[in-house]
Amino acid sequence: MKLEMICTGEEVLAGQIVDTNAAWFANMLMEHGVECQRRITVGDRLEDLVAVFQERSTEADVIVVNGGLGPTSDDLSSEAMALAKGEPLVENKIWRDRLDDWFTRNGRVMAESNLKQALIPESAIMIDNPVGTACGFAVKLNRAWLFFTPGVPFEFKQMIKEQFIPFINERFEIAGDVALRKYLTLGQGESSLADALETIVLPEGITIGYRSSMPHIEIKLFARGKAAISEMDKIEAQIRFLLGTAIVANNKKSLAEEIHALLIDSGKTLSAAESCTGGMIASQLISHAGSSAYLDQGLVTYSNESKVKVLGVKPETLDDHGAVSIATVEEMASGARAILNSDYALATSGIAGPTGGTEDKPVGTVAIALATKSGVYSQMIKLPRRSRDLVRSLSTAVAFDMLRRELLDEAVIVDYGSIKRFQK
């Protein structure tokens, strides 16, 4: 099955919004063993939409069209498809009744423009949208099935999972013997990872892919067929041997998700005292439901005064060593842990840039500490030539990895290929 995607909208084409739907879709389908082979972005111009529908329908088996199903004048997907097919738009009675009911239940008067959302090409199959006012539809043109979806992300994702996957599985039998494993890495560039793994001889049906999502690189091990799946453990063992400490999580979207799971399982508690990361540690954990079970507090102690008054950092420590130092960050972590007697506390203090660096402590210098009930671990890392946001996100990731290793009873401080440390 040859799958393609057409994304519509001037704001997407002009880069005014980031097309997260396309990235999510390609990843979702890959997990089902289907590769999206082409993606095209088209603006809100009727003739361009008609042309691309006609052209791609002769090459692809399935085309997902995203966007252009709203009630406004620049929502043109339905009209363009009808023109491409050479048939009229007709009102779908089921969806018209659904619209009437939706507006009545929500105590609103339906605008005349909303009636447009019940118009679909005459030969189209209506696709339900239980969470929005724009129905989807599927229509056959030339070789391809074109599957039209709303642009609103949560509507799009639900339609893909509940409607599109069953639709293509019924017609193309995509469900089969496929398996996907993901490994989240830290501290190694994509080319370095690829070089390290190039010695692996992959059996037929197994592929290795890479996806950069800073501060991590995700490695995907994909197998198709029973024979290939049976070889995955052996290939995974080679990946782990070659990459060593670079792998920080399995089948997780982020290191924060891994920490969340480990803290839930362990029953341990955590406090955070953040300076340069500015609450990023706490924020990433709080994005996961249930974090209240372990997160005692998240403190942004940005000024020296707050470090002293809130965390109990000694003024002489700041005078002698500075805010960005092993001594200061260790006292920050110890102070944060002591406030609520947490099992662990993470602390960060650094120079995220673009200014503020010195010869001894250039921009990208970050001190990180992990306080436990038995002691404190600390390191000061170098992150030169990174943006302010990347310095903060990398520092957060290193802090999380220190805690992860402590929770797994591993060495807390390890070497990373692209992240250097100051010697204590």
Swiss-Prot record:
InterPro entries: CinA (IPR050101), CinA-like_C (IPR036653), CinA_C (IPR008136), Competence-induced_CinA (IPR008135), MoaB/Mog-like_dom_sf (IPR036425), MoaB/Mog_dom (IPR001453)
Species per Swiss-Prot/TrEMBL record: Shewanella piezotolerans (strain WP3 / JCM 13877)
Entry superkingdom: Bacteria
HAMAP family (alphabetical): CinA_B (MF_00226_B)
Family the entry assigns: Belongs to the CinA family.
Annotated protein name in UniProt: CinA-like protein
